[in-house]
């Protein structure tokens, strides 16, 4: 049985019903509609912590989806799963693919920055100061891009940029 037919909570059921109605009235081709069903099922599985099932659905959606913007969100969600599973390199790969298709996605830019910052922290803990600084600089560049797109978000990142002297631009109010 498809995941969308076994949702147990009210919000998931409501979302599924609304998505089905939208799919029926939107002038989308069958392939795009099928891609959306896989994407929707992937999101549902991801929300339930069923990451393997979510990835299966996202990969199927990627095979069908042609719109670059929609593909960017699928890739972004795949990145989130890999990050949640501790595979930062794989997460970076998918976040970067997402940003390549949609450079105006601050959440992906932020997540890239978070990974570089984390890697910088690890390098510093291991006494690799130069590498840590290079990773922090990478994190700063991605956070600046995210903040330019969403200046009211990422307050902790804005503060970190200021405290570390990496905020030479005036996007922070």
Curated annotation (Swiss-Prot):
One of its GO terms (biological process) is photosynthesis. It is a peripheral membrane protein. It comes from the Bacteria. It is found in: Cellular thylakoid membrane. Keywords: Membrane, Photosynthesis, Repeat, Thylakoid, TPR repeat. TPR repeats lie at residues 35-68, 72-105, 120-153. GO terms for cellular component: plasma membrane-derived thylakoid membrane. This is Photosystem I assembly protein Ycf3. It comes from Rippkaea orientalis (strain PCC 8801 / RF-1). The lineage of its organism: Bacteria, Bacillati, Cyanobacteriota, Cyanophyceae, Oscillatoriophycideae. The gene is ycf3.
């Amino acid at each position: 049985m498809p995941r969308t037919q076994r949702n147990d909570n009210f919000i998931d059921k409501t979302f599924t019903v609304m998505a089905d109605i939208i799919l029926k009235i939107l002038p989308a081709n069958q392939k795009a509609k099928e891609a959306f069903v896989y994407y929707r099922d992937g999101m549902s599985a991801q929300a339930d912590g069923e990451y393997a099932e979510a990835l299966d659905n996202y990969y199927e959606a990627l095979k069908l989806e042609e719109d670059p913007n929609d593909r960017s969100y699928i890739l972004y969600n795949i990145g989130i799963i890999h990050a949640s599973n501790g595979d930062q390199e794989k997460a970076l790969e998918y976040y970067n693919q997402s940003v390549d298709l949609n450079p105006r996605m601050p959440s992906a830019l932020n997540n890239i920055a978070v990974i570089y910052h984390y890697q910088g922290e690890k390098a510093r803990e291991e006494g690799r100061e130069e590498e840590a600084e290079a990773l922090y600089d990478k994190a700063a560049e991605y956070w600046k891009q995210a903040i330019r797109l969403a200046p009211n978000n990422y307050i902790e990142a804005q503060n970190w940029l200021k405290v570390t002297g990496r905020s030479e631009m005036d996007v922070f109010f």
